[in-house]
């Protein structure tokens, strides 16, 4: 029997390319691809999965992650995430991608950006500082040749380097993901080579110059509409600042933090917590200020959705206290809170990413010719998105993973002790990329 070939019978299909439920269908999966969806399909000598009249929807896509180890791949699967876009890439991610593609390990489909590119005055070892246009060109060519899927540009990139990267990316045929730059007017960052702009807080902090002013929003939202740019809100990543301020040290000592990579937990989580704890000491109103900005982020999202902007769900997971996997459910709940319907919220993590990159076209919906990336739940997630938190089983690239195995992946990630290995990989990044 082919492990990636099945008939899934007696299942209710949530296709996601339209707002409907196809009751009591059979799905024929062959070599990891959906071949047919009908009321009745007969295929000889094939493994049959009884869908038990449950609900099958496309696997979730997290469009803004920071991946540190194999255990996080398991955490994503355990939460129904079958595709991730890693946005701080280096050699390790290319190796993981290769292993996933050769089925040596199981995990979500992995797409990774290059290292984060910025200009020479934007300090920090997490970024590659570019001094000359020649250097910028060479890096884009090199990243494409090495197998990175996208170029990631960062907040300190100046206009000259930005234009050089844009031009070389066009020539090299590689799209760009933009953390908007502080050095360039926000509305000038919608180049056709840019596939998506990240982070709602950058609209407030850059485009609006920290003013929570709804009257200044329309031209910004219209720019997204006119340019057909995808927008990745990362509401959860910003909200974690409020959680740190509101809940105190508890958030870096107990609970969800135990699923973070130990190097991040030891260094980044503490650094971020201390930064905001110090801010609170000096500014008693900071908690309220951050919460007000969070609510404004939800308002921005509501207005974007009303205008038909292509919103793609991304969490900023893997840094600070934003946990890989589980954060997608918090992100979707924020979209719901912002006023999106369950269907519109779920679109952001399924069908909408397919409009962002050509590499994603075979995902995001349950249709003929698409990858067999599924979540199966007892009840209908279009009635309650929380159903997605508890998959009965999932399928990734046609490989079925049952509930027991998913639970094991979560347990394997909890309080893991790979700090030294992660530190060595980070050292490799510093030596190779910088």
Predicted regions and their residues:
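Acidic, glycine-enriched loop/beta-strand segments at the rims
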Residues: 13-26, 39, 323, 341-346, ...
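Active-site neighborhoods of metal-dependent hydrolases
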Residues: 145-150, 157, 209-334, 430-434
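Mature N-terminal segment immediately following signal peptide/propeptide cleavage
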Residues: 3-30, 35-36, 51-58
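Divalent-metal coordination cores built from histidine and acidic residues
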Residues: 51, 55-56, 73-182, 194-200, ...
């Amino acid at each position: 029997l082919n492990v990636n070939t099945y008939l899934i019978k007696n299942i209710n299909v949530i296709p996601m390319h339209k707002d409907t439920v196809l009751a009591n269908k059979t799905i024929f999966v062959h070599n990891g691809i959906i071949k047919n969806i009908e009321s009745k399909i007969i295929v000889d000598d094939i493994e049959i999965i009884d869908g038990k009249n449950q609900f099958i929807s496309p696997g979730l896509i997290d469009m803004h992650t920071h991946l540190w180890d194999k255990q996080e791949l398991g955490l994503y699967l355990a939460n129904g995430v079958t595709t991730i876009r890693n946005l701080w890439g280096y050699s390790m991610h290319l190796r993981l991608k290769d292993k996933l593609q050769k089925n040596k390990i199981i995990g979500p489909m992995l797409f990774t950006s290059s290292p984060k590119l910025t200009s020479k005055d934007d300090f920090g070892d997490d970024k590659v500082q570019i001094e000359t246009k020649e250097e910028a060109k060479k890096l884009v060519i090199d990243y494409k040749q090495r197998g990175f899927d996208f170029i990631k540009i960062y907040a300190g990139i100046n206009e000259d380097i930005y234009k050089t990267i844009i031009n070389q990316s066009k020539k090299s045929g590689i799209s760009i993901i933009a953390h908007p730059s502080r050095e360039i007017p926000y509305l000038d960052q919608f180049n056709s080579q840019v596939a998506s702009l990240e982070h709602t807080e950058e609209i407030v902090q850059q485009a609006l110059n920290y003013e929570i002013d709804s009257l200044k929003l329309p031209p910004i939202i219209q720019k997204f509409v006119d340019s057909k740019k995808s927008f990745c809100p990362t509401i959860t990543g910003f909200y974690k600042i409020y959680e740190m301020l509101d809940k105190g040290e508890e958030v870096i000592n107990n609970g969800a933090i135990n699923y973070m990579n130990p190097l991040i937990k030891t260094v980044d989580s503490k650094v971020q917590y201390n930064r905001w704890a110090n801010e609170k000491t000096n500014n008693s109103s900071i908690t309220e200020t951050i919460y007000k900005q969070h609510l404004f982020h939800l308002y921005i999202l509501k207005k974007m959705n009303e205008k038909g902007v292509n919103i793609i769900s991304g969490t900023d997971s893997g840094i600070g206290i934003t946990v890989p996997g589980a954060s997608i459910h918090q992100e979707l709940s924020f979209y719901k809170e912002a006023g999106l319907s369950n269907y519109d919220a779920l679109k952001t993590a399924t069908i909408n990413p397919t409009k962002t990159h050509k590499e994603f076209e075979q995902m995001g919906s349950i249709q003929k010719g698409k990858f067999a990336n599924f979540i199966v739940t007892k009840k209908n997630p279009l009635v309650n998105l929380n159903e997605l938190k508890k998959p009965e089983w999932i399928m990734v690239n046609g490989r079925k993973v049952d509930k027991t195995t998913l639970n094991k992946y979560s347990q394997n990630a909890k309080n893991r002790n790979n700090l030294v290995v992660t530190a060595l990989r980070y050292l490799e990044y510093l030596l190779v990329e910088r």
